[in-house]
Amino acid sequence: MRHRSSGAHCILSCNHVLSQLNAARLGDEVLQPAPADGGVLPLSIIGGVLGWTPVAFGGVERNMTDAAIATCAPGQARSWVDGIGAITAVAPAIALGARVRKVGRATGLTSGIVTVVGASVRPNYAPLGFGQTPALFVNQIVAQIDCAYGDSGSLLVDEENRAVGLLFGGTRSGHTWFNPFDAVCAALDIALLDEDARREAPGTVS
């Protein structure tokens, strides 16, 4: 991803992954792989927290995104997902029944269909150790696709490899929740690395 305002190359994940659910400070070190996967200081540092979308708790105030970005070296940022390939664009919308895929840290490459658009969901972050009351998220995408702890931050794509959503939660019955990707990009002021170039090139469609 690219941060539009600064031009910085960055990685994208969830607020609760990169920013400790609103508790991070700008510039906090980000490790890849994470400590749970064998990452160690200082060898695994890839950058620092650049920004996040705050999550409001209490179940009344509405949230749209649980997302965050961190800086990285230009050569480390790619509009590419292993197992899926190049991400071609940001999908303007997604239809019920659309076939989608994602690659997650825990469950790998899985596919499914979109079952709800415009959903309201209340993820419970307490099992992740944050000890917060549930938060209300509106206008979310729900897909019948496998996920597990560790998959948060995965990118959901459609059959044209367009970015559809950012995985942030789900249920044990296989209903997985995604922030709409266009809302994530707008909230964090980010774009795919070559998105602007495609839009400006004559005769191209993005």
PLM feature spans:
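Charge-biased, low-complexity intrinsically disordered regions
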Residues: 193-196, 201-204
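A short, polar/charged loop-to-alpha-helix boundary motif
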Residues: 173-185
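Serine endopeptidase catalytic core focused on the charge-relay Asp
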Residues: 1-140, 144, 157-160, 164, ...
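Short, small/polar residue-rich loop motifs at catalytic or cofactor-binding pockets
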Residues: 148-151
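Short beta-strand-to-coil "C-cap" segments at the C-terminal boundary of structured domains/repeats
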Residues: 72-74, 188-191
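Short, intrinsically disordered, mixed-charge
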Residues: 17-19, 186, 190
